[in-house]
Design a protein with these regions (language model features):
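Flexible "stalk/tail and boundary" regions
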Residues: 1-8, 12, 22-78, 83-84, ...
Length: 163
């Protein structure tokens, strides 16, 4: 699982060093594509292939679905690491995410986000918004209780009841 934040730089050739603990999650490389917030998303191959399967089940007759297809797939590239653990970001993806100089790598569960440091800092207020966070967390059950009421079982994250 991709968790945590890392601060690095992108060099003039578009290469970003990815920490070894994150590279360990991507032994075969992955797929790099546009994110939804002027960032990039780096997926493990198996997760991107699952995403592709799910997205391609959507009908292409709806304009919003075609927009999603284009957003995710037209800019996607395979991502491989060089000998010293850097991933190459093509110019059009650097432009999309406004990457130059300082960058932030942010874990997002089953993928890694790559942000310009300035965009990441600008979005800090939104991430800290307690009202929005409350609404998002209301979508899942964070009680983590087992049937017997003990809190020592593995979490069962599912939709929260809407009573």
């Amino acid at each position: 699982m991709f968790i945590g934040e890392w601060y690095h730089t992108i060099d003039s050739k578009g290469r970003i060093t990815v920490p070894s603990r994150l590279r360990d999650l991507l032994p075969d490389g992955g797929y790099l594509t546009r994110g939804f917030d002027r960032n990039l998303m780096l997926y493990r191959r198996k997760d991107f292939e699952r995403l592709t399967t799910r997205v391609q089940q959507l009908t292409s007759t709806k304009p919003e679905n075609r927009q999603l297809f284009r957003h995710l797939f037209s800019g996607a590239v395979t991502a491989q690491f060089d000998k010293i653990g850097r991933v190459m970001v093509p110019p059009y993806l650097r432009d999309y995410a406004r990457l130059s100089g300082e960058v932030t790598l942010a874990g997002a569960g089953n993928y890694l986000e790559i942000w310009s440091a300035a965009e990441w800092a600008a979005s800090a207020e939104q991430r800290a918004n307690s009202e929005m966070n409350g609404q998002q967390f209301a979508l899942i059950d964070l009680a983590f209780t087992s049937a017997g009421g003990a809190n020592d079982s593995a979490p069962d994250i599912g939709p929260a009841s809407r009573a």
